[in-house]
């Protein structure tokens, strides 16, 4: 198969322009003034040319300039509309506004956000503000936003619902898909229900989820995700196993899911002997219905579009057309919405589709040498997608899934069965519930198999191997993947007939030429494998040698949340427990901690208390904030039942941890304000053994300024940055602290834009070294032996550094 790659360069140029200009829209006008004339000039030069090669090259460059100019024009038009002056003024003044908006994604439970009542049930979803009201004045707008709000007391919000929400708004980071963040102050009020077709799909999804819940074990929890992309029943343990084994893509509605559905319809059409055009039309209509059923979120719409590319490529009878068609789709989407260029989901959708178009066929033929052709094709599809996406996946998690490919080979063939059979059961539930229940039990079998593969793979030793992060990790993974595929898929030379003399010598030279580039490729792979294996073998010894034996502070890498340990000898304090018990338990095991002398829970958001199960029964004293509801009080009871002394803390409380002194700096006891939620975060400072530290919880800017006025901490060596590095920070407080190290406990690709550029600039201005758990992993601070106050900073993924 010959691939047509002529539009790939244009798509790459358009993507680069979109990525750059979406983060700096103020340059879009100047870019147009440069690119449009360049495109016109090149077009004028091309027309009279007769040399085909030069003509083709200049045409490519002209198309690249025109594509980039279209992106610049799109941003110049869209940027002011995305962020009108009414929104920027409301954000700057922190004014309370009333937003009328349409829900565009399924709400998910969120861990925390500034300004909302603590302890309440909160959700996050994408939406579009259609009207903004303030002070009796209303203005029509069209602003893409991410909304953080209390969950309504009645039915859950659904896609397509129009709501009214009293809220405050903040500008998002430049380049984000959302132009602003909306923080609701009260539960949303429903203004209009979704259209009938969205309501029908929501009812069908609810029926399917309820029926699947009756099935046993992880198979029942996983089935809605495999069939219709509903992962609400997937618990943390199963979710972690799916991610560790590189199977989480099976529960996200992707181009592969859409392709499975359309492929089933095409097969049915072939069985009914329909014409090709009729089969394609039927498949496209089915795809449209599937999109409605699984919720028409932006990511699902993109997946459906990628599946359409595969469908049209296959249906045309010329698979080689798929690459230019994919390139054209990328160009159109990025011109229509340049902010997609920074979306990881879009990147992975494009790469997975490209992998299926380019790699699935050759891999299937290669595997077909040792197994039946149909089985080879089934295995080649997930393998091609995994190989194409892996270089980008290391940006999200700088690890290599050792068993990812075998797990996909084992689970991959079961996924389309679970999808198709589960989807049939879902569609039959309203009309033939008995028949649907029987089919649902059949769908449970492949679902349970996938869950078992995920659990087994995740439990094996070395299931996630450390790898390079950032651009180095992408480049290294891409190079090694390319060399491996080139060696495996390159055709071997045909055996030459027996010859003598000069002909024989020429034949040997030809075979040597075939080996020419393969010898260095094998050498590079062997060197890389040997070096990496050696680093893994030596990592335990290297870690033991580099890890500061007398460390005092350790920030655990537990995702989007806080869990920081303070130590003196064999005495340990833990400030917050993060969102996930398994992640916290792994960190405590790494640090060799089995007992917590002092536990501080700054407030009750899930990203600070969700991991509590990891320490129940291991805590001596717990300092907590004021409880707001029965759920908070039950948490106190669980700690007490586990043997902990639970005390509500406030400013002025003091104590010791071995040779360290600690003091609570916030909140003020008895104050009518800032007692709960982020503004009421219990703030603790430690002093002793040469290091002063302060832990700011999720304090917002107003609370930080109030802390300065009430009990200024003074200069410290280490500060745990507030609220994972959000924008809502007091520059004055960090200037007062003048910390040497700023610990930012934050999750990779967290969706909030944490840590923000504003926070990083604040730290840079006071020469505080920013240490991020999302990029550097576990971070440990110690006092340099004999260093006269110098600190040693050790991080899991960055070499040790010393700070004066």
Mark where each language-model region is.
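Aromatic-rich juxtamembrane segments at the membrane interface
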Residues: 2-19, 170-171, 175-302, 311, ...
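Membrane-interface helix/helix-cap signal primarily in integral membrane proteins
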Residues: 2-3, 54-249, 586, 595, ...
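Non-globular, low-confidence helical/coil segments that flank catalytic cores
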Residues: 2, 152-166, 192-196, 235-239, ...
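C-terminal region of N-terminal signal peptides and the immediate post-cleavage residues
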Residues: 23-27, 72-92, 299, 340-341, ...
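N-terminal leader/targeting segments
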Residues: 1-87, 183, 302
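Alpha-helical transmembrane segments of multi-pass integral membrane proteins
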Residues: 355-462, 740-745
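Hydrophobic alpha-helical transmembrane segments in multi-pass membrane proteins
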Residues: 235-404, 469-545, 626, 643, ...
């Amino acid at each position: 198969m010959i691939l047509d790659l002529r539009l790939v360069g244009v798509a790459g140029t358009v993507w680069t322009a979109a990525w750059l200009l979406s983060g700096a829209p103020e340059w879009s006008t100047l870019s147009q003034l440069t690119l449009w004339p360049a495109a016109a000039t090149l077009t004028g030069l091309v027309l009279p040319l007769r040399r085909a090669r030069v003509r083709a090259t200049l045409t490519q460059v002209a198309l690249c300039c025109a594509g980039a100019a279209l992106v610049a024009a799109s941003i110049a038009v869209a940027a002011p509309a995305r962020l009108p002056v009414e929104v920027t003024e409301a954000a700057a003044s922190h004014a309370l506004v009333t937003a009328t908006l349409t829900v565009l994604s399924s709400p998910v439970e969120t861990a925390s956000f500034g300004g909302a009542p603590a302890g309440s049930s909160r959700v996050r979803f994408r939406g579009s503000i259609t009207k903004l009201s303030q002070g009796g004045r209303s203005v029509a707008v069209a602003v893409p936003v991410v909304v953080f709000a209390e969950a309504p007391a009645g039915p859950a919000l659904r896609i397509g619902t129009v709501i009214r929400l009293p809220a405050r708004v903040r500008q998002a980071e430049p380049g984000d898909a959302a132009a602003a963040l909306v923080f609701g102050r009260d539960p949303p009020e429903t203004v209009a229900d979704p259209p009938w077709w969205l309501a029908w799909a929501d009812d069908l999804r609810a029926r399917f989820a309820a029926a699947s819940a009756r099935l046993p074990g992880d198979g029942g929890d996983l089935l809605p995700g495999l069939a219709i992309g509903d992962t609400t029943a997937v618990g943390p343990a199963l979710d972690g196993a799916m991610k560790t084994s590189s199977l989480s893509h099976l529960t996200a509605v992707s181009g592969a899911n859409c392709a499975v559905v359309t492929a089933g319809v095409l097969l049915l059409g072939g069985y009914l002997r329909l014409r090709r055009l009729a089969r394609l039309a039927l498949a496209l209509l089915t795809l449209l219905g599937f999109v409605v059923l699984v919720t028409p979120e932006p990511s699902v719409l993109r997946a459906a579009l990628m599946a359409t590319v595969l469908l049209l490529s296959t249906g045309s009878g010329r698979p080689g057309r798929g690459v230019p068609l994919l390139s054209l789709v990328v160009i159109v989407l990025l011109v229509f919405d340049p902010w997609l260029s920074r979306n990881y989901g879009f990147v992975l959708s494009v790469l997975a589709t490209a992998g299926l178009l380019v790699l699935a066929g050759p891999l299937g033929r290669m595997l077909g040498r040792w197994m039946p052709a149909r089985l080879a094709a089934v295995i080649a599809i997930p393998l091609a997608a995994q190989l194409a996406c892996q270089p980008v996946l290391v940006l999200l998690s700088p690890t290599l899934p050792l068993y990812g490919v075998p797990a996909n080979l084992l689970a991959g063939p079961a996924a389309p069965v679970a999808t198709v059979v589960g989807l049939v059961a879902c569609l039959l539930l309203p009309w033939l519930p008995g028949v649907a229940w029987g089919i649902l039990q059949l769908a449970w079998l492949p679902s349970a198999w996938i869950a078992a593969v995920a659990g087994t793979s995740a439990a094996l030793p070395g299931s996630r191997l450390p790898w390079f992060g950032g651009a180095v990790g992408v480049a290294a993974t891409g190079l090694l993947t390319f060399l491996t595929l080139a060696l495996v898929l390159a055709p071997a030379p045909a055996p030459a007939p027996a010859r003598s003399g000069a002909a024989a010598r020429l034949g040997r030279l030809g075979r040597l030429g075939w080996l020419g580039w393969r010898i260095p490729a094998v050498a590079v792979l062997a060197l890389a494998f040997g070096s990496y294996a050696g680093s893994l073998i030596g990592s335990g010894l290297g870690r033991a040698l580099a890890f500061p034996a007398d460390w005092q502070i350790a920030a655990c890498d537990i995702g989007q949340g806080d869990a920081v340990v303070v130590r003196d000898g064999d005495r340990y304090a833990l400030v917050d427990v993060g969102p996930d018990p398994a992640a916290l338990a792994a960190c405590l095991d790494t640090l060799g901690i089995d007992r917590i002398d002092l536990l501080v829970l700054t407030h009750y958001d899930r990203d600070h208390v969700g991991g509590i199960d990891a320490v129940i029964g291991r805590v001596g004293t717990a300092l907590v904030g004021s409880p707001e509801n029965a759920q908070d009080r039950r948490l106190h009871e669980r700690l007490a039942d586990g043997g902990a002394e639970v005390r509500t803390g406030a400013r002025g409380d003091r104590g010791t941890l071995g040779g360290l002194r600690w003091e609570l700096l916030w909140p003020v006891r008895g104050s009518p304000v800032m007692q709960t939620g982020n503004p009421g975060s219990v703030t603790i400072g430690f002093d002793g053994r040469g290091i002063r530290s302060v832990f700011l919880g999720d304090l917002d800017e107003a609370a930080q300024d109030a802390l300065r006025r009430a009990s200024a901490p003074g200069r410290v060596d280490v500060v745990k940055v507030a609220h994972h590095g959000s924008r809502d920070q007091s520059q004055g407080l960090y200037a007062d602290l003048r910390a040497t190290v700023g610990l930012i406990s934050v999750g990779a690709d967290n969706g909030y834009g944490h840590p923000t550029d504003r926070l990083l600039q604040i730290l840079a201005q006071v020469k505080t070294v920013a240490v991020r758990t999302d990029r550097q992993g576990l971070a440990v601070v110690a006092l340099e032996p004999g260093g006269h106050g110098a600190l040693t900073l050790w991080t899991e993924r960055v070499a040790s550094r010393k700070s004066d």
